[in-house]
Amino acid sequence: MIKTTPHKIVILMGILLSPSVFATDINVEFTATVKATTCNITLTGNNVTNDGNNNYTLRIPKMGLDKIANKTTESQADFKLVASGCSSGISWIDTTLTGNASSSSPKLIIPQSGDSSSTTSNIGMGFKKRTTDDATFLKPNSAEKIRWSTDEMQPDKGLEMTVALRETDAGQGVPGNFRALATFNFIYQ
């Protein structure tokens, strides 16, 4: 139980009623201590480029619409999210995804409507752990997450992922250039 003595209350009231309390400028100096760092996350893989500001581009080679419609391996690309420099106190990493989700296929991210560089229609991209099926696509803008295993958190391993181009409406895909933005978010514990 905290006991408050009367003289402390008087001092507090004197401070609260002082004209200096109503000043328009307040400067605060403080010292913060960071107890644990997080991790540096990079994206690696064939056809992956980094612009130097941790913005990555993954290019999937040109293919026919039939490859996307038939969900062949040519319509997807593998990459890894690699964690390095993690604090020893980090026991897990969760990954979530944000992007412009398709209304008809909410697990697929589609191009922004104002992006004139993307000329496809009814095509989106989905993200999943490598070697899993399309039912495991990570739903953007949701609480769905992928929790990294202890092994995947090692700098020489990483979280192996696949991005796949798929029709948002079966049989309705229109070929062209595809460009969409996905943002991976990381939560550490």
Swiss-Prot record:
Keywords, alphabetical: Fimbrium, Signal
Record's subcellular location: Fimbrium
Gene3D superfamilies xref list: Fimbrial-type adhesion domain
Induction pattern: Repressed by H-NS.
Pfam families: Fimbrial
Polar residues bias: start-end ranges: 113-123
GO annotation terms (biological process): cell adhesion; cell adhesion involved in single-species biofilm formation
Keyword Membrane in annotation: no
Disordered: region residues: 104-125
GO CC terms, sorted: pilus
Signal sequence extent: 1-23
Primary location recorded for the protein, binned into one broad class: other
Reported phenotype of the disruption mutant: Deletion of the operon under classical laboratory conditions does not result in any major effect on E.coli capacity to form biofilms compared with the wild-type strain.
InterPro entries in UniProt: Adhesion_dom_fimbrial, Adhesion_dom_fimbrial_sf, Adhesion_dom_sf, Bact_Fimbrial_Adh_Pro
Similarity comment: family membership: Belongs to the fimbrial protein family.
Its job: Part of the yadCKLM-htrE-yadVN fimbrial operon. Could contribute to adhesion to various surfaces in specific environmental niches.
Note: The operon is cryptic under classical laboratory conditions, but is functional when constitutively expressed.
Name of this chain's protein: Uncharacterized fimbrial-like protein YadM
Originating species: Escherichia coli (strain K12)
Gene name of the encoded protein: yadM
